[in-house]
């Protein structure tokens, strides 16, 4: 389960920009993508605070959030602030919907997770020309 949580978040980040452009994307799936991007933005702040990343990583995560929020058709953003705050505390939701500490759950270690997630965000932004 530990690996699936973190691998899923990274995969969602990497694949976000391809799936988000899909016409007629299911509203529930779009909300999930948005919630993940908001949680990831909070996690980038957490990683910067730990000294693993630079402030630019937070800016990139915010660009990703803005991109997803602007997808035509309306994105349910109601839980966004809560998801981002959870990330700033170093927490994610696992597959069962429980809040877990990323630091304890990252099989590759927190610093490596931060760097991999940051790279995934950069690649995603590059793929959409930002």
Label the predicted regions.
Residues 16-22:
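Sec/Tat signal peptide C-region and signal peptidase I cleavage site
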Residues 16, 34, 41, 107-108:
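Processing junctions and N-termini across compartments
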């Amino acid at each position: 389960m530990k690996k699936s949580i973190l691998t899923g978040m990274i995969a969602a980040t990497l694949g976000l920009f391809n799936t988000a452009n899909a016409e007629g994307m299911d509203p529930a799936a779009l909300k999930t993508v948005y919630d993940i991007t908001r949680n990831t933005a909070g996690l980038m702040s957490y990683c910067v605070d730990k000294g693993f990343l630079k402030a630019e990583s937070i800016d990139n995560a915010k660009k990703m959030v803005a991109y997803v929020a602007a997808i035509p058709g309306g994105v349910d953003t109601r839980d966004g602030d809560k998801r981002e705050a959870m990330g700033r505390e170093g927490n994610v939701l696992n597959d069962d919907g429980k809040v877990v500490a990323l630091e304890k759950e990252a099989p590759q270690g927190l610093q490596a997770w931060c760097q991999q997630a940051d790279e995934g965000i950069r690649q995603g932004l590059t793929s959409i020309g930002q």
